[in-house]
Amino acid sequence: MASLLRPTPLLSTPRKLTHSHLHTSISFPFQISTQRKPQKHLLNLCRSTPTPSQQKASQRKRTRYRKQYPGENIGITEEMRFVAMRLRNVNGKKLDLSEDKTDTEKEEEEEEEDDDDDDEVKEETWKPSKEGFLKYLVDSKLVFDTIERIVDESENVSYAYFRRTGLERCESIEKDLQWLREQDLVIPEPSNVGVSYAKYLEEQAGESAPLFLSHFYSIYFSHIAGGQVLVRQVSEKLLEGKELEFNRWEGDAQDLLKGVREKLNVLGEHWSRDEKNKCLKETAKAFKYMGQIVRLIIL
């Protein structure tokens, strides 16, 4: 009973946990930071759809300019002249593909080539005949008559600019043929070469003014640049140096040709690049036909 009556010991009052006690009694293996770590944000500048300014810049980068044809910056007749010179050099085996030479050097070389050509003639590398020269004059008359008649009679406005240029040769050649008849020489009929070329000129005149005019200019250019020299040399050999009407103009031939050249260049400004390229091909054909007619002199 005594044990039962023994007073039960009072439980000790629990200690009040203060903030400091709580802090020391609770621990973690790591620290929790309430501050966020700074993050690096990258701006994605690549857009799936380009802006208008970016599109324009991209288009400018892709623009490629084609290489100009020789003489294109001056006019279509200058392009034709380059074709003629290239044909002349190839046929004479004097082709030079170098583009690094100055204009002065090229002019000096051209003058040297002209001197070489004169030397070749003086050395009698070819022997003309009266019969062949008559064929040449007859075919030349047919060709000049064809182009002059076309520009006079055609209703094409482009051809009207080339009427009465002062370069006309048909009547002049007819006077020479009449004089040769008086020398008891028989005037032949036009050869197949002249007839074929005249027919071709008629076809081109009906199909395309630019193509026909490339022949028109090339024919006069050919005679003034080299044909008249050839006629004079043949006359010295066969006709005692008589000055033929074929080589006489009322005015300076170069000035007259310049007038035609300027008109053709103005028209050429309205032609497409494709039309101009076709004109250059026709220029080569024109010199091919004229070369065949010249060769009649020695056949």
UniProtKB/Swiss-Prot annotation:
Disruption phenotype: Slight reduction in plant size and chlorophyll content, and early flowering. Residues 58-67 have a biased composition (Basic residues). It is found in: Plastid, Chloroplast. InterPro entries: Haem_Oase (IPR002051), Haem_Oase-like (IPR016053), Haem_Oase-like_multi-hlx (IPR016084), Haem_Oase_decyc_pln (IPR016951). Residues 1-20, 45-70, 96-126 are annotated as: Disordered. This is Probable inactive heme oxygenase 2, chloroplastic. Widely expressed at low levels. Pfam families: Heme_oxygenase (PF01126). PANTHER family: HEME OXYGENASE 1, CHLOROPLASTIC-RELATED, INACTIVE HEME OXYGENASE 2, CHLOROPLASTIC-RELATED. Disulfide bonds: none annotated. Residues 1-83 form a transit peptide. One of its GO terms (cellular component) is chloroplast. Residues 1-15 have a biased composition (Low complexity).
